[in-house]
Amino acid sequence: MALFKKNYDRHTHMHGKAGNATLSRSHAGNFCVFLFLLIVGAFMALPLVYTLVQSIKPTEELFTYPPKFYVKNPTFDNFKQAFQLAGNLWVPFTRYLFNSVFIAVVGTSVYILVASLAAYPMAKAKRLPGMAFLSQLIVWTLLFRTEVTAIPQYVVIAKLGMVNTYWSILLPALAGTFGVFLMRQFMVSAIPDAILEAARIDGANEYKIFWRISMPCVKPAWMTLIIFTFQSLWSATGGTYIYEESMRMLPNVLSQIAAGGIARTGAGSAVAVIIMIPPIIVFLISQSSVMETMAQSGIK
């Protein structure tokens, strides 16, 4: 009995040491991963930090060499200069702002609806003929870069008479397939077929099932899609389809102000900061849903 107890204690002690060593290695590995991601995140944030610092630097600090990532005497003169220059443009600044807000808000809202309506039958109407092929076709279209379809898109827009209109920006955006792919993949795994069948048995039509069951279940997906779509449309310039100055977007203000040479470096940075604010706000509002989407994608 004593010999058995001695062997048991030795065995437990050895396994305890092995468990502690494994736990220590796990903590060390997690720390290394965290440190690596922290360094990568810092490098990714450097352009944003540098632009923000440049926007509040006085003129005498803007052109120091080597460039500094800090400011000794912060000032908002660059923002004042930016608004003064924006007031002297051919078209009022508010017109550029309205164009960008209209395109971003309307385009994002309509695209979420279109992508969801297109993805729902691909994910849940499996009995319809051609759904599998159509789903594969959506994936294939993701292989083509925007430059490949630029000329065909322009020809279509020109033939439809939509040049110099909001439709020249909205229509190509609404035809994007990334949102359809994202929503379909999420609907396949996030919406159980049993729930849909139970709703149909209870007398719910497809319209109610889509809005009251399907869309709430895939909220993380369409919140993520809102961020990507809003960012894409907010930064759109419409340079290919828009020629009238009154129809141009807010990023054109940055290009016009920056065209003044190095004397407008600070004002250009100030405008860049102003343009970055709305997408950052949208991301912060939707951040929790984005993290949930990434977590569920990792689980799948």
Q: Where in this protein do the model-derived segments appear?
A:
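A hydrophobic, multi-pass inner-membrane permease signature
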Residues: 2-300
